[in-house]
Amino acid sequence: MFSGAGRPSKEQIKQYDNLAVGEMKKGASVAAVLLLTPFVISFFQKMRA
């Protein structure tokens, strides 16, 4: 993951942290949408019934 020998610089660490946080937020929102979809569909079906 890190290029070159030795410890990564603080800037690199910050970059990777931001990337990881962004990916986690993306994953969490996708998971939330997938979890909520059945409830939303059944809600609209009840409204139309």
Swiss-Prot record:
Any Pfam family: Tom5
Keywords: Membrane, Mitochondrion, Mitochondrion outer membrane, Protein transport, Signal-anchor, Transmembrane, Transmembrane helix, Transport
Compartmental location: Mitochondrion outer membrane
Keyword flag Mitochondrion: yes
Entry keyword annotation includes Transport: yes
Membrane topology qualifier: Single-pass membrane protein
Spans through the membrane: 27-44
Protein family (similarity comment): Belongs to the Tom5 family.
Role, per record: Component of the TOM (translocase of outer membrane) receptor complex responsible for the recognition and translocation of cytosolically synthesized mitochondrial preproteins.
Protein known as: Mitochondrial import receptor subunit tom5
Annotated source species: Schizosaccharomyces pombe (strain 972 / ATCC 24843)
High-level lineage: Eukaryota, Fungi, Dikarya, Ascomycota, Taphrinomycotina
Encoding gene per record: tom5
